[in-house]
């Protein structure tokens, strides 16, 4: 979705306007990240997040985040409860991503030219939407990723 980076909370409210937006601190590893949702009117009062801020149009989707983890061209999936529904959690369940999600994740990888990344996707009524990309994510909850990483690095070293 359209995303803006702003430096002050006043700019957060201006960027949101009448739209519902998701606001979070830019950067960092994602642990303990606070997310606030609202319109400019609802975002008048500063919420204690650290600047700079990401202001992202709200995507109407279910209460599940589709986390896609890539090691080279290999894509693994983890379903996690949305932090908007339950707050931050490390719990999730591995799943086999649909071909359209695999293709989307690979497109992001190709565009960024990264070997290791995480792509957070929400599935809305109009289709999947990338809401976050992490270079070298934690891969927590993905049982075969250590072997995938080792195999990928060995193959790259041998090339």
State where each predicted segment sits:
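Hydrophobic residue at the +6 position relative to the catalytic HRD Asp in the kinase catalytic loop
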Residues: 119-121
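Phosphate-binding site of ATP-dependent enzymes
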Residues: 17-18, 27-112
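Short beta->alpha connector loops
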Residues: 6-10, 59-61, 115
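Protein kinase-like catalytic core scaffold
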Residues: 21, 54, 76-77, 117, ...
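C-terminal active-site "lid" helix and adjoining low-complexity regulatory extension at the edge
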Residues: 110, 114, 123-159
